Amino acid sequence: AYVTAKAAVYGMTRALARELGPERIRVNCMVPGWVMTERQMRLWLTPAGERQIEERQCLPDRLQPSDIARMALFLAADDSAMCTSQQFIVDGGWV
């Protein structure tokens, strides 16, 4: 169900961007990685999880809520005036 829901969000993003573009309404989606919220750290950040992050994430830092907020602010700003129909991945380079 998770993968299906993600695909639906991507499809909806593209369809709405196409439909609303003539009105200069931009539609994008953000795809966050494993954000270090208090809940994530309390419930799921185990030593094995830490190792997985170290092995799979290109950047050494941990993804913080502020990293996601900065992307949202960019998308809301005039700096992203020509960005639409896109998936903005904020995940520290997860591979």
Question: Predicted segment positions?
Answer:
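Active-site helix of classical SDR
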Residues: 5, 13
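Conserved catalytic core of two-component sensor histidine kinases
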Residues: 6, 69
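A glycine/serine/threonine-rich, flexible loop-to-helix segment
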Residues: 22, 34-57
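Alpha-helical segment proximal to the catalytic Tyr-Lys
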Residues: 18-22, 81
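A conserved structural motif in NAD(P)-dependent oxidoreductases
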Residues: 57-68, 79
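Short C-terminal tail/terminal secondary-structure segment
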Residues: 73, 84-95
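Conserved SDR Rossmann-fold cofactor-binding beta-strand/turn motif
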Residues: 26-36, 76, 89-91
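Catalytic tyrosine of NAD(P)H-dependent dehydrogenase/reductases that use a Tyr as the general acid/base
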Residues: 2, 10
